[in-house]
């Protein structure tokens, strides 16, 4: 999959397989 690490100040991650661990997207196990 794609690496996570985008910021998610809106609470949303646009990278598939990532979830928001404010303020950075983290990979969903």
Swiss-Prot record:
Keywords: Disulfide bond, Knottin, Plant defense. The keyword Disulfide bond applies. Disulfide bonds join 4-18, 8-20, 13-25. The keyword tRNA processing does not apply. SUPFAM superfamilies: Cyclotides. This is a cyclic peptide. GO terms for biological process: defense response. There is a cross-link at residues 1-29 (Cyclopeptide (Gly-Asn)). The presence of a 'disulfide through disulfide knot' structurally defines this protein as a knottin. Belongs to the cyclotide family. Moebius subfamily. Probably participates in a plant defense mechanism. This is Cycloviolacin-O16. It comes from Viola odorata (Sweet violet).
